[in-house]
């Protein structure tokens, strides 16, 4: 650094970077600490002082293993210099004060150097490790300077609260002196420093970047922070392990939200077999996506918009696969409504004994030999005769008059048995005709969608819910609403 005889040479001194050619001599206590860290000389640059301080803290393992930004030095010579038992890297003011007291600048022949160094020390710490060390160490120079630099340092301290955009006494802006310091990046340092602090605060250092820079904030670094931090300036792809815990928290929150949403759809017994639930949930999520794609009514490529039918009540267009309007639940007009119902037929063949019974009764009336009727074939109770109701109704009136004339009670009982069996068959037909009407009712759970979700358990199934509700029941391992059995599979049924 050149000597300064007048104030006109101040800009040149301000542009001198800290740590470049500035030789400092530590006092005896600090020098002893630096030699323990591996220093062999007695004159250092600012970078070398910071390097050996970091090596000393690493060698003695003074940092806290859990909270790595805290350094404990109460039983160490470093603590005697700092006059504190412990300090945090986030608040390195004790280190600044120690460096002011224990560093002496060499080759300090005039007041210009003291002025430039004093201006550097009065500024607040900047956003890289170089500025931490240089700003803190140079602040000690006004304390050890000669009396000739007193006036200039006072003028520099008076200009401290001024805005950076204001001009200094020589006509140049103050930012001209600060700009070289802001350009000092991690690439100018060697591969050494405080890796324990860097690794512990790597996440916060990168998340606080708004301009994409990988430089580390000063208020998060120790004064021993030096060259080793440059090794990660271009290794942003290796930071995957830092976001692993956050991704696990997000997945847990998503799973909890899905469980809360499913619990609103009447799904009891959700806590059964929790060990299998975690494995089945992943499979069910994939199956749900596949089901929604292959079982959706809109995935049929052969059905076009021209085939859609319009509801006569609410004027909504529906797909031709649905016979009910999805909005008002009205039946589609002319949906097989006028077609006659088929008569339920019975596969039992006609029995000639019943059809020929009236003729035989007339023949037996003409005969006066036997007064007791003995029918040839009387069926037992275990093998009943089931005939259509209309045939029984025709046979009974024609034979009622003749059978009442002198016939035994067995034949009369037989006719009444046939009549009762015909009535029971009529009730059976009515029940079978009523069962399809139950399918017209909406879902038992949501009361909105049609019953198209077939819940299968074993060799039986129940069609009492819609397909979305049935999938929710299967997903959350709820029993069948109809019988309480375990749901094995859910399929979508198209009723036409």
Curated annotation (Swiss-Prot):
Biased composition (Polar residues): 1-11, 131-141, 210-223
One Gene Ontology term of the molecular function aspect: zinc ion binding
Family annotation (InterPro entries): MDM2_MDM4_MUL1, MDM4, p53_neg-reg_MDM_2/4, SWIB_MDM2_dom_sf, SWIB_MDM2_domain, Znf_RanBP2, Znf_RanBP2_sf, Znf_RING/FYVE/PHD
UniProt record, GO biological process: negative regulation of apoptotic process; protein ubiquitination; regulation of cell cycle
Keywords linked to the UniProt accession: Metal-binding, Nucleus, Zinc, Zinc-finger
Zinc finger (RanBP2-type): 305-334
Compositional bias of kind Basic and acidic residues: 275-286
Start-end of RING-type zinc fingers: 443-484
SUPFAM superfamilies: Ran binding protein zinc finger-like, SWIB/MDM2 domain
Keyword Metal-binding: yes
Stretch list, region Disordered: 1-21, 115-177, 210-229, 259-302, 350-428
Subcellular location: Nucleus
Positions occupied by motif Nuclear localization signal: 448-451
Residue ranges with Low complexity bias: 146-158, 397-410
Acidic residues: bias regions: 287-301, 361-373
Coiled coil stretches, renumbered: none
Keyword field contains Manganese: no
Quaternary state and interactors: Binds to p73. Interacts directly with p53.
Function field: Inhibits p53- and p73-mediated cell cycle arrest and apoptosis by binding its transcriptional activation domain.
Family, similarity comment: Belongs to the MDM2/MDM4 family.
Protein name (record): Protein Mdm4
Organism: Danio rerio
Gene that encodes the chain: mdm4
